[in-house]
């Protein structure tokens, strides 16, 4: 069996009620999509442990979940703030030009002039488009520590090469 690669897709929040329910914070594009990716793993004391989802529902505008074996508030409290992960193998293949954020994080960003702008450290969602957060190297000639580059495929992002972990952008190094 191949080694699992776990990607964080959410986090458990505070307890809800006395029967072992927990609030859920999903980092998937659509909050309910987190339930499409099973099984879940929780990071407990630095180790990923598989858990089974028993039930979920909306309470007001929050998602709440019940995990198997979590029957009371005290047991649920042990899981508060635990990250929720899933094996990357459960993610569906995307169409060309679409990328999962976890594939872009860690890529080197280079502009059309060949200037190494830094490494993608995270992604941000804005109302109109996603944004690459690029941390510059310590010897950045423009004195930049971080750049925010819109992920506009073809307009700004010219090429994504996941094999070499390189993103080529049409972006002035001074910005």
From Swiss-Prot:
Pfam families, sorted: PRC_RimM, RimM
GO BP annotations, alphabetical order: ribosomal small subunit biogenesis; rRNA processing
Gene Ontology MF annotations: ribosome binding
Superkingdom: Bacteria
Statement: the UniProt record of this protein carries the keyword Metal-binding: no
Domain PRC barrel: 95-175
Cellular component annotations (GO), alphabetically ordered: cytoplasm; ribosome
NCBIfam families the UniProt entry points to: 16S_RimM (TIGR02273)
Recorded domain comment: The PRC barrel domain binds ribosomal protein uS19.
Subunit structure: Binds ribosomal protein uS19.
Family statement drawn from the similarity comment of this UniProt entry: Belongs to the RimM family.
Protein name: Ribosome maturation factor RimM
Organism, scientific name: Glaesserella parasuis serovar 5 (strain SH0165)
Gene: rimM
């Amino acid at each position: 069996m191949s080694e699992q690669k776990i990607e964080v897709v959410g986090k458990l929040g505070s307890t809800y009620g006395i029967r072992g329910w927990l609030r859920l914070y999903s980092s998937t594009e659509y909050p309910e999509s987190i339930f499409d990716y099973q099984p879940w793993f929780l990071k407990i004391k630095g180790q990923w442990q598989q858990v089974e989802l028993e039930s979920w529902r909306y309470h007001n505008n929050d998602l709440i979940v019940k995990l198997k074996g979590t029957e009371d508030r005290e047991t649920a409290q042990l899981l508060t703030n635990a990250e929720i992960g899933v094996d990357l193998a459960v993610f569906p293949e995307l169409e060309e030009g679409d990328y999962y954020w976890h594939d872009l994080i860690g890529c080197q960003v280079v502009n059309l002039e060949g200037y190494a702008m830094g490494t993608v450290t995270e992604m941000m969602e804005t109302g109109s488009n996603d944004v690459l957060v690029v941390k510059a190297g310590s010897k950045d000639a423009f004195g930049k520590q971080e750049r925010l580059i819109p992920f506009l495929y073809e307009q700004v992002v010219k090429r994504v090469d996941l094999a070499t972990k390189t993103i080529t952008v049409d972006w002035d190094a001074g910005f």
